[in-house]
Swiss-Prot record:
Single Gene Ontology BP annotation: bone development
Domain Follistatin-like: 70-92
Name of the protein in question: SPARC
Entry GO MF terms: calcium ion binding; extracellular matrix binding
Post-translational modification: N-glycosylated.
Location of the protein in the cell: Secreted, Extracellular space, Extracellular matrix, Basement membrane
Sequence positions that bind Ca(2+): 273, 275, 277, 279, 284
Similarity annotation: Belongs to the SPARC family.
Amino acid sequence: MRAWIFFLLCLAGRALAAPQQTEVAEEIVEEETVVEETGVPVGANPVQVEMGEFEDGAEETVEEVVADNPCQNHHCKHGKVCELDESNTPMCVCQDPTSCPAPIGEFEKVCSNDNKTFDSSCHFFATKCTLEGTKKGHKLHLDYIGPCKYIAPCLDSELTEFPLRMRDWLKNVLVTLYERDEGNNLLTEKQKLRVKKIHENEKRLEAGDHPVELLARDFEKNYNMYIFPVHWQFGQLDQHPIDGYLSHTELAPLRAPLIPMEHCTTRFFETCDLDNDKYIALEEWAGCFGIKEQDINKDLVI
């Protein structure tokens, strides 16, 4: 499913087709404690762009491996790998960048916020790990997916167009997930009920490369169709922790793939943070997309 979501993000290049330039932003990747995969439906997060790991084999085999290798279920953050100390206790250590798999194409490259291209995200995070505890390491973040390129400034006129395309894209992603959901658990039952109303509405603007004037008119005419998609995306991003606020880290999975296609991405999210506290609350997020204050409802974040 995560591969399917990556495909949707690629399609966003057309739906969100503005000049292919962007500004520098930040991403901080937190180390995750060892946690096994929970029962969250695969694909519940529409902005995860990494491929999941697939384990084949019977339970007995897995149990034997775990017993022989304590690192089996010890998860480390990006840039680190598990090794055993003298007492056979698993620990996370920085990965040697040279041990990263060789890239197979340009699409694997990433750009850091100091405008340096890395062969892959593995190479970037392994390098960042070696700089832990230094000023340079603290400031170094993954900016966007793809090799570094010239990023033009986002003009005020362009900034006003960004939420028009983004709103339409969010709605279309939800509708697509709904159409592909049969037997795939892409959406929860509550989400399906909400999206069903959008899907069956004959007034819904079909996905396509529409002029911003049409997108603006559609938002005005069919405003109610956009309320849930905006809330839904906030809920997909607000994961670590689930606290009603989006950090730079939580925004990164959405931001990084969009920046090469939408050069106003960084500035848009910066303007959403009205109180400049480095976090975007639900009220700020919804307001950025034109949702009226009386229609902002935490119960819609499902």
